[in-house]
């Protein structure tokens, strides 16, 4: 893609990845405008948030390359949309992914409404790539070629972030560019150190994008409080303790249980009776699933039927992820009356309702979309 005649907005987070994005664009003779999206809490004295340091880093990098930086306050929209989604899901016993929805609703959504609509392209530091092609279509007997843009994986399987982008809309993907998506993380670090970027040695952020050092359970507790209930051993029906709220636990969880006689892992939640079921390992298969349904499938570029052609009797050949890991699991995808059924090539630990199952082609190259797991 020729970028020379494009108006480009760069989303700077204060981290090394988006900073190298700016360097890469400036190196090509471009002068994009930079934006820092404010989504963190306002109560700085109550929340141990790193947003102030993030903004300082973003400011320093933008000034280094002579680009203007504008702070875009998306705080209210984040808490109205992403936080509400998260709390509704966890209260219902599901396992949501706030970062997936942040990309769709905030970084490529609200930002576009406020500023991004003035730009041809929006550049971010995501580890992802894109491909463009044209397909022939006929409308009202007129034939034409329609351009398509595919979301594709990064060559760095550990850092690949296509799973976090699998819910964005096609029009959002059309405007997105990922200038470091073809690089390995080590290469990005080397560029940052060579260019003496202020955040070259800064650690990567972990967990939900704005929380910083805030504990996720404290974030949940702020909105939902605590609701104690029984913890029951699945195999024996024996009560082994109490939990402080089902929303503090996820299916497949092994750590941080706080019960004696372990190890334990969470296998089921009864939201109506407020019971947490755990297994001591008598029947470890209770924590594994090989087939599971997904609903509300969101296709990125084309409907799945067009990606694969006619449905096969054995289902569509795919690879998939249910969490942010380097592994792409082979399987098949079978259309059903109200969604799809995923058949995994092997049993998977910790399949939980509310998780996004991200679907890729059989070579785990193109990301085709994602759906929410239902059990």
Briefly describe each language-model feature range.
Residues 1-166, 193, 266:
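ATP-dependent adenylation/nucleotidyltransferase module used to activate substrates
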């Amino acid at each position: 893609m020729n970028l020379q005649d494009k108006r480009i907005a760069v989303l700077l987070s204060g981290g090394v990845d988006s900073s190298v994005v700016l360097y890469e664009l400036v190196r090509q003779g471009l002068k994009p405008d930079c934006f820092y999206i404010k989504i963190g809490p306002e109560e700085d004295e109550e929340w141990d948030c790193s947003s102030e340091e993030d903004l300082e880093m973003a400011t320093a990098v933008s000034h280094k390359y002579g680009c203007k930086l504008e702070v875009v306050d998306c705080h209210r929209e984040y808490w109205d949309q992403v936080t509400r989604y998260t709390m509704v899901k966890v209260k219902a016993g599901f396992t949501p992914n706030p970062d997936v929805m942040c990309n769709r609703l905030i970084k490529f959504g609200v930002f576009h409404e406020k500023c991004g609509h003035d730009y041809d392209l929006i550049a971010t530091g995501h580890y992802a790539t894109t491909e463009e092609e044209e397909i022939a279509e006929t409308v009202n007997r007129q034939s034409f070629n329609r351009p398509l843009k595919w979301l594709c994986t990064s060559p760095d399987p550990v850092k690949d972030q296509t799973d976090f982008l699998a819910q964005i809309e096609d029009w959002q993907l059309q405007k997105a560019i990922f200038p470091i998506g073809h690089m390995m993380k080590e290469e990005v670090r080397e560029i940052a150190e060579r260019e003496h970027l202020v955040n070259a040695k800064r650690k990567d952020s972990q967990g939900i994008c704005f929380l910083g050092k805030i504990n996720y359970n404290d974030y949940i507790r702020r909105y939902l409080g605590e609701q104690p209930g029984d913890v029951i051993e699945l195999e024996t029906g024996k009560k082994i303790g109490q939990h402080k709220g089902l929303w503090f636990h996820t299916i497949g969880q092994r750590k941080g249980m706080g019960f004696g006689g372990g190890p334990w892992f969470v296998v089921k939640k009864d939201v109506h009776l407020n019971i947490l079921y755990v297994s001591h390992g008598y029947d470890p298969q209770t924590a594994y699933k090989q087939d599971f349904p997904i609903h509300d499938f969101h296709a990125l570029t084309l409907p799945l039927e067009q990606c694969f052609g006619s449905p096969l009797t054995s289902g569509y050949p795919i690879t998939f992820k249910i969490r942010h890991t380097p592994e792409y699991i082979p399987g098949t995808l079978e259309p059903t009356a109200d969604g799809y059924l995923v058949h995994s090539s092997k049993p998977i630990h910790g399949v939980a309702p509310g998780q996004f199952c991200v679907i890729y082609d059989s070579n785990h190259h193109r990301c085709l979309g994602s759906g929410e797991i239902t059990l």
